[in-house]
Amino acid sequence: MLDVAIIGCGVIGAAAAYELSHYPLQTAIFEAENDVADCTTKANSAILHAGYDPEPGTRMARLNVEGSALAKEICARLDVPYLQCGSLVLALSPEELPHLQKLYENGIANGVPGIRLLSAEETLAMEPNLAPTVVGALYAPSAAIVSPWEFALAMAEVAVRNGVELHRSCPVTRIEKTAGGWALTTPSGIVETRYIINAAGISAQAVHDMAAPHKFTIQPTRGEYYLLDKSEGSRVHHVIFQCPNENGKGVLVAPTVHGNLIVGPNADPVEGDDTACTAAGLAFVSAAARRSVPNIRFSESIRNFAGVRANVDTGDFVIGEAEGAPGFIDLAGMKSPGLSSAPAVAREAVKILEAHGDLPAPKADYRDGRTRVRFKELPPEEKARLIAKEPAYGRVICRCETITEGEILDALHEEIPATTIDGVKRRCGAGMGRCQGGFCGPRVLELISKTLGISPLDVLQDKAGTNVLLCETKQEENHHD
């Protein structure tokens, strides 16, 4: 029997696994998709928020500030791309200045460090490409940007290294109460566990309702984005927000840790995991963004994408044991600032186990830490040494991002190995650049096929059913005249 079963391995499930892996518990993760971080965690704004937006006294307010500080430490320890660039919330008219004052007061109450109000002149001095109509801004120096999928992957990898089991393509379809805890029905059979952590993202309501009386409703909400080429990456140097409204923090413009510019999102209620991009949605995003940064060159867009976030009707994170279901722990409704809060949210689950007296002493032999080979960032002498040791690092496969064969092979041999083309992209960046895999994609497919010992026809782009190749069009034949 398991001690803890975690349902879902986005950033919340990965953070929970990372925290629990510090203890001698039998813990397993059950992820419905074929990879970690393959839903909301891979398609969001990639912001670690400072914490001025949530209403004081809410879980969001406390866990946002705590989580962002913990995330900074974890990213440093696990070699995850992170940059504390700060954020600006703009007032684009005098009528919006009272809203900035309210956010400032929230920030003070929530313990956000270094937060202050700026004049129009101070704001434009920091970001000269902003609209000249700016009348002021709220500056939060603790806001940061991160690679969200690498953040989740890193925590999940360290958890697996320390004994947590990960079951991919393994949805939980039924939950039943037993004398000793819970029984989960999965494609690989019945799994018994003492505790369940519900970290199922937009599916968290459905998972909760399998085990306990209905308590909350999640409305999946789609947000569409532009990702612009690195030629636009320095258009702004801070995360640029407009004044938020009831639909969220509005359309932002921000640098990314990879050197691009990200613009979005809108907020459209959808059914399920509908990540289609729409002409109307993208037109709204570009028009809204130009209110903040008029000279963005959307002609430099290299990709449009959409993510779905879990808007919940409680107005706050849903955290705790479900009523009438002891041992079933919800970590649900993780809309923004869910990414920022993830490490602190995970610790809330650990506290529940501790309160029940079911948290043993931490492991003495815990193996923390993680390093990555990022070939293009190495000094020349280190590149030469690495190539001499492993010639695959001398063969550049992705020319846009200067990603080598060695890095792709690393992605295919990690604690949680990539099994798809997008899985490789999320781990090492191959296909992330200007051509979006147009040149390197076939070579990545070939390496996946060879390394995993599967037919090229079985290699997926991402989720189940996204086979890149459908059939062979030519076969070698011997012709004799």
Which residues make up each language-model segment?
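C-terminal catalytic lobe of FAD-dependent flavoproteins
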Residues: 248, 257-258, 273-396, 403-416, ...
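Iron-sulfur (Fe-S) cluster-binding segments and ferredoxin-like electron-carrier domains
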Residues: 404-415, 438-456
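Glycine-rich FAD pyrophosphate-binding loop
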Residues: 22-42
